[in-house]
Amino acid sequence: MTVGRTWAVVLTGLHGDLIEVEADLSSQTPAFVIIGLADKAIGEAHQRVHNACANSELPLPRRKLTVNLSPASLPKQGSALDVAIAIAALATEHALDRDSLAQTAHIGELGLDGRLRPVPGVLPAVAAAARMGIRKAVVPFANREEAALVEGVEVL
């Protein structure tokens, strides 16, 4: 599989929008490109994701990796998409369960060592994901109790 997909959530105030995170591998010169109206923090995600994956012994492929954050017209900000970007990127070459990824929102910042760091706004993010049919959420441990307040979502 060369295209990996999963879900994330971006917040505007307390309003959350579901974002499809797609990663595609191509045989071009190695690069890591993020597209889809991302701010500087998301633009820097490629370095956090690359180092976190390498330091977790899950190195990313040495090919061109393009990550699309859709809908492209919606502004995206902050580091809470790091985990979703990493999962979509890893799904391009690793056998991750597509059905599970299609039902899961990944929310959190990655440390360079691979740790998940807490992010603000997990409660409204998970609530927005639940309203849009998402039934599982991967969040940093420090945000777990907050995320668990949303009924109908399994917090991992």
Show where each model-derived region lies.
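Peripheral, non-AAA+ core regions of ATP-driven protein-machinery
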Residues: 1-156
